[in-house]
Amino acid sequence: MPAGTGGSENYTVGHVRELNRRGEPAQVVTVGLGIEDGRNEFTDVPFHSLPALADVAELDGTVVFVNEPHDVATRQPAFLILHNPPPIRERHRAFAVEGTRDRALIVTSRYAARLWSDYLDVDIATVSIVYPFAEPCFATHVRAANDTGRTRVLFAGRLSPEKGVYTLLETLHIDIIEQDPELTFTATTAGVDKPQGRIIERLLIEHPAISVVATRKSAESMAGLMTTHDIVVMPSNSQYWHETFGIVSIEAQHSGCRVVASDDGGLPETDCGGVILIAPDNAEALAWGIRAAVDSGPLPAAVREAAGMRFTVEQSVDALLSVFTRPLPVSPRTIVRQLEELILAPSTVESDSRLRLQGVGGSPDSMP
């Protein structure tokens, strides 16, 4: 679970940290990684590594699976937090469906609740929502004065196709962007731990219109990066991927940045007053979205302050604890089992009919 690689890692670690701060013992459990599971990058968070997935069955307390719906028995009813959209390949469907049949489901937005309830064919009321959050430092980090005379644009997402990096590359060549010397663009190396990320990194390094800086592996360092930029772009793909939320948008607004984001998935739910929504997968739309953000000027301090009071870690953990304490919905597996038992149970009508045919309990004329 390397730091600086994605929102689900920050979400998980942030929850565990806040739970322990409140005196609620919690830990991050990894499988098959030993001590090389990322714990060295989160020294204030307890980690526990298991040799094999089956060992999860021996854990005490509440077990929360993150993203991967492994069908493993647990001592108590378990939860599953789904940060990603459902898989689009049919070969992955059985794993997703089977692994969620006996779990209490948690998602990160209203959009994700609708998406997963449709995919799994379950009542949307049985899917709980626990919104992500920005760490407090994003709202409190001081913004330095911009003495460059330029508008600084940051792509803070992972270097992966679904985050819209190729749309951004197209946008760099559109006239209203390319011909403006007062625009600067920066991306980080988040995601270069994957092969596709390393390929995209090389493309960006070769491009004269964008700078590449090292990924930030802590909330504090990312807040420092965002507060030296004016606009954060999130041109996420909508063809084969849908952002279920978009925590970078929250972090950016808490940091005092405007956000230009795809009007898709859960991204509209991240608007704290500083989001400009654009048509996804559309370089021209992204270009005009950036221009609109430039024309709007810096995000007002009052908007940043108000944004900083929304989507906090305290609010997120309050919601999580509420999910843990409320009665659990009946799982799909339990419903199927009950239906099977009902089908296999002797019918009352059939039993009564047999009795009547044997001359017990009324005449044949009284049968329905």
Regions found by a protein language model. Give the residues of each.
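A charged, aromatic-enriched C-terminal amphipathic alpha-helix characteristic of glycosyltransferases
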Residues: 7, 49, 138-140, 295-350
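A conserved mid-protein helix/loop that constitutes part of the nucleotide-sugar donor-binding site
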Residues: 10-14, 151, 160-174
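Short beta-strand->alpha-helix junction loop in the catalytic core
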Residues: 111-112, 129-140, 190-192, 307
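Glycosyltransferase donor-sugar binding loop
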Residues: 32-34, 183-198
